[in-house]
Amino acid sequence: MTAPTGPTGPAGPTGPTGPNVTATNAYAASTKGAAFTVLMSGTNVALPDAQTLSPDITVNGANDTFTVAEAGRYRVSYNINSVTPLTLGARLMVDGTEIEASNVMPQTAPLSRLSNDFLVDLAAGAKVSLQVYGYAGLVTLLPNSIGASLSMVRLS
C-alpha cells in the first residue's frame, strides 16, 4: 500500500544561464560596386564593407576569408548581385574545400543574382570564403546596394 503524496516543497534556486551560442555571428558585404576578375576554378569575393563580426570571427586583410574560433553548426547565407547577368556559379569554401550544400552551379542562362541558405558544421579555426567560379572574366557587383554579402550564425 502506498501512502498519499506529501506537500510540494519550496522551489530551488535558479540555475546559471546557459551559453548564448548565437552570439557567435558575422555579417559582411560589398556595397561599392567592386569589379574583379574571376577564374574558372574560382575566385574569393572580398566583403570589405558593412562588416559586423563577433569577437570570435575574424577576417583576413583581403576581406575574403573569415576564421571562426568556435566549433559548431552554423546557419550560413550569401547573396551575389552582379550588374550584368553572367553564367557563373557561387559556393562556400571551408579550408579550401567546397561545401556541397552551398553550391549554386553555373547556369546556361545568365543570372545576375545568386543566393543560398544552408547549415554547415564548422571546426574551430575553420577558414570560410565566399567564392564565384565557372566563368572567366570581369564581374562587377551592384554599387550603392548589396553587391555581395555573407552571413554566419552559430546555432549549436
Predicted regions mapped to residue ranges:
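Extracellular jelly-roll beta-sandwich "head" domains, especially the C-terminal globular C1q domain
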Residues: 4-156
